[in-house]
């Protein structure tokens, strides 16, 4: 077998490559054609063929998307479909998987819608930063819609059930046809300029793209963007989108949901109202208590400054002054009495009788026995003076101070000089506590 440099593929590999090529080259396409061979098996998926006079292509629309179709697909119906090209690898079938399909009459409207939406988005009309918040408690609501449609019945029914105290003004308008957009725009501008309403609701029921086209009007979209009053848009069903939905401050999927967004359920408000009442009662009691305390303080101040209170104060001051005066007088009298007593004592100290008694005492001191006593004391003093003089010349006293008396043992004579003794001579030294024998050694004199 000859060698081949080319890559050899299996059918599955080839189909996978073809699928990648298709999906990469055609991410999203719109096709206008006629339906043929329409089938819907028990799975809920929708299979059919789109064809024109010269060609056809197999198509599939799976259940999550096919259930939202607003028409019944049937043989020969002309449609506008959007989807992605792909390849069913198991059979090698080339097909279109759709995510949207509508009747072909809406195709031009759809393209106009997409173009206007892109232009308004580029201008910033859909930006979240410019959208207003809904008030926490809506008291007055303007509803712009058809007075005979299902939408107004749904809105009023929900509002009456959830919050019957809400004041609602119905501003009737056409919601379909050539003049509907201009009428809705005019009502919106008048309601906004009045300043009467907390929120303006623009709503209608479901329908085809053509039925809902009034809510894709550029003038209406710009009026919603310019409104000072918050605007809620609830147009069609959950899968319907209009330009009013994109521009409005809040988009609700249905009219009923819009009504639920705007007001609270009165059953949920009852506990909140009761809590608020309890809090109000508590605040009232607190305020009343404070007011009563202030009144009591003012009454005390008034009583303190009343004439009767001032008279009582003066009376108390008079009594206190009387007590202080009495105490002062008592002190003065006591001091006077003390001075009298001291004067009496001084008079007594100069009494001749007391002076005479002193002289008598001195006379008794001159009695002979007293004279002898004084003589004895004088002699004793002289005796002690003589004893001190004798002690000063006593040799033993000198010895007691560390000196010695040297004598010759033979005759007891006192040695007074070193010249009186010879070397080798024995002497006696008298000390304070006894005597000792000593011998004279040769030495210098």
Swiss-Prot record:
Chief place of localization: cytoplasm
Broad enzyme group: hydrolase
Subcellular location: Cytoplasm
Keyword Protease included in the entry's annotation: no
BP terms from Gene Ontology: DNA catabolic process
A GO CC annotation given for this chain: exodeoxyribonuclease VII complex
Protein name: Exodeoxyribonuclease 7 large subunit
Organism: Xanthomonas oryzae pv. oryzae (strain PXO99A)
Gene: xseA
């Amino acid at each position: 077998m000859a060698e081949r440099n080319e890559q050899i593929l299996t059918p599955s590999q080839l189909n996978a490559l073809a699928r990648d090529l298709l999906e990469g080259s055609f991410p999203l396409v719109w096709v206008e054609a006629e339906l043929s061979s329409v089938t819907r098996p028990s799975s809920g998926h929708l299979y059919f063929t789109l064809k024109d006079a010269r060609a056809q292509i197999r198509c599939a629309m799976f259940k999550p998307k096919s259930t939202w179709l607003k028409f019944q697909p049937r043989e020969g119906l002309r449609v506008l479909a959007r989807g992605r090209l792909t390849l069913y690898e198991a059979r090698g079938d080339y097909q279109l998987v759709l995510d949207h399909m509508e009747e072909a009459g809406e195709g031009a409207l759809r393209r106009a819608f997409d173009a206007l939406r892109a232009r308004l988005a580029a201008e910033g009309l859909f930006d979240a930063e410019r959208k207003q918040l809904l008030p926490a408690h809506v008291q007055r609501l303007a509803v712009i819609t058809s007075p005979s449609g299902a939408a107004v019945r749904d809105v009023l029914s929900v509002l009456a059930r959830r919050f019957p105290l809400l004041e609602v003004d119905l501003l009737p308008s056409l919601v379909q046809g050539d003049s509907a957009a201009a009428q809705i725009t005019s009502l919106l501008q008048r309601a906004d300029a009045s300043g009467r309403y907390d929120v303006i609701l623009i709503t209608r029921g479901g329908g085809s793209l053509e039925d809902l086209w009034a809510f894709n009007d550029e003038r209406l979209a710009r009026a919603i963007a310019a409104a000072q009053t918050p605007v809620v848009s609830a147009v069609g069903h959950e899968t319907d989108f209009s330009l009013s939905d994109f521009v409005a401050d809040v988009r609700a999927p249905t009219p009923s949901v819009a009504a639920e967004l705007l007001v609270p359920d009165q059953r949920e408000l009852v506990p909140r109202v009761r809590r608020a009442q309890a809090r109000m009662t508590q605040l009232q009691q607190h305020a009343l208590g404070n007011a009563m305390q202030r009144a009591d303080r003012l009454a005390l101040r008034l009583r303190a400054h009343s004439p009767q209170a001032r008279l009582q104060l003066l009376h108390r001051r008079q009594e206190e002054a009387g007590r202080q005066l009495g105490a002062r007088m008592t002190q003065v009298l006591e001091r006077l009495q003390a001075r009298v007593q001291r004067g009496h004592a001084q008079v007594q100290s100069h009494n001749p009788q007391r002076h005479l008694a002193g002289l008598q005492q001195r006379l008794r001191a001159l009695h002979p026995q007293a004279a002898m006593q004084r003589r004895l004391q004088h002699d004793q003093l002289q005796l002690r003076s003589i004893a001190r003089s004798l002690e000063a010349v006593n040799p033993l006293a000198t010895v007691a101070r560390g000196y010695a008396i040297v004598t010759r043992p033979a005759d007891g004579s006192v040695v007074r000089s070193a010249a009186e003794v010879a070397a080798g001579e024995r002497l006696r030294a008298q000390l304070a506590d006894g005597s000792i024998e000593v011998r004279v050694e040769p030495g210098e004199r």
